[in-house]
């Protein structure tokens, strides 16, 4: 078992390791284009034309994507888009109705148990035993994977160190903060030294400091060559962590690509948010100077490559508040899935 130590887990990794398949250096959001050929050993997860229905409801519809070993791949979509079902399919907890799934070289669900032995899962809601200490929870998770006492004695201290919980090792989970509990859940997912991590909303409910600490820990895992499948509603999280991402709705893939490339392709200009006026009326004023305008409640979103002209048209109007900013991944997500509320 490879142990996580201060020597091989950098607290501030400068870049991802080089991929053998890519034969190039990877910086920031750069990664191989999905069209490049990969050897089987370089593919962590592959879904090909996968469909899944429950009764008359199609939850996953002819979905295909490939995740390269060592990358963070984001799966984004509104509530009910099918993200949780995709995770269950990848883990072999539900069989597909159509299509094929390969995880870490194993056909799923036929050899799902073998694949799962090399996977760590961080669920949306913690499954920690609140009466047990941090150390005892790690012991319990280790037993699930059949690890012996000696192996656990070697593995647990570095994991507590990784999660920055060394001083809380013998404190009951109920007495830990939300951020500490989330880091402990991540440590539990690493107890079997997995090649692949599946993360479901890993920072939901955390304050900004705790969230950034989780992100820093996840980046250190990527620097070690771990593969991550991330489902999240938090667009900043996807932008910071993901090499590539896929947006799905009603179980179908809408778009796939690198975060910054998708922002350029789907938005490509500044965004001006306009508050305090009648958005329908203002649309006719700024519309001729915008590539696109959208109304959400009492807010007008103006997408323009000439934002100064938009500001000029609104000059002198009282009661208006303008926020000009560069486009972000949330703009892409809302453009593709709509701004209306979804349950």
From Swiss-Prot:
Its main location: membrane. Gene3D superfamilies: P-loop containing nucleotide triphosphate hydrolases. It is an enzyme of class 7 (translocase). Residues 1-38 are annotated as: Disordered. Residues 45-275 form the ABC transporter domain. Its EC number is 7.6.2.-. ATP binds at residues 77-84. It is found in: Cell inner membrane. Part of the ABC transporter complex NodIJ involved in the export of the nodulation factors (Nod factors), the bacterial signal molecules that induce symbiosis and subsequent nodulation induction. Nod factors are LCO (lipo-chitin oligosaccharide), a modified beta-1,4-linked N-acetylglucosamine oligosaccharide. This subunit is responsible for energy coupling to the transport system. This is Nod factor export ATP-binding protein I. The gene is nodI.
């Amino acid at each position: 078992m490879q142990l996580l130590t201060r020597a091989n887990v950098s607290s501030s990794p400068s870049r991802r390791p080089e991929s053998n398949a890519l034969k190039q250096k990877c910086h920031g959001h750069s990664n191989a284009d999905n069209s490049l050929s990969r050897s089987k050993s370089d593919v962590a997860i592959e879904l090909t034309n996968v469909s899944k229905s429950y009764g008359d409801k199609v939850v996953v519809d002819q979905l295909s994507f490939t995740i390269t070993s060592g990358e963070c791949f984001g799966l984004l979509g509104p509530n009910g888009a099918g993200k949780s079902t995709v995770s269950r399919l990848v883990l072999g907890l539900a069989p597909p109705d159509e299509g094929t799934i390969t995880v870490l070289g194993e056909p799923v669900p036929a050899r799902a148990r073998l694949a799962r032995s090399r996977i760590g899962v961080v669920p949306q809601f913690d499954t920690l035993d609140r009466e047990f200490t941090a150390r005892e929870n790690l012991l319990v998770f280790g037993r699930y994977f059949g690890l012996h006492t000696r192996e656990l004695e070697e593995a647990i201290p570095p994991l507590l160190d990784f999660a920055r919980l060394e001083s809380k090792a013998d404190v009951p989970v109920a007495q830990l903060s939300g951020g500490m509990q989330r880091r402990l859940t991540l440590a539990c997912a690493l107890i079997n030294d997995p090649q692949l991590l599946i993360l479901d909303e890993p920072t939901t409910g955390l304050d900004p400091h705790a969230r950034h600490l989780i992100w820093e820990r996840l980046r250190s895992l990527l620097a070690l060559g771990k593969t991550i499948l991330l489902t999240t509603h938090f667009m900043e999280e996807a932008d910071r962590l993901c090499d590539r991402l896929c947006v799905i709705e009603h179980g179908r893939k809408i778009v796939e690509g690198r975060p910054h490339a998708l922002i350029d392709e789907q938005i490509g200009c500044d965004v001006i948010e306009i508050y305090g006026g009648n958005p329908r009326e203002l649309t006719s004023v700024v519309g001729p100077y915008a590539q696109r305008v959208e109304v959400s409640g009492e807010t007008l979103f103006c997408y323009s490559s000439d934002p100064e002209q938009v500001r000029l048209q609104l000059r002198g109007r009282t009661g208006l508040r303008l926020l000009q900013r560069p486009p972000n991944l949330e703009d892409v997500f809302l453009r593709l899935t709509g701004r209306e509320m979804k349950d």
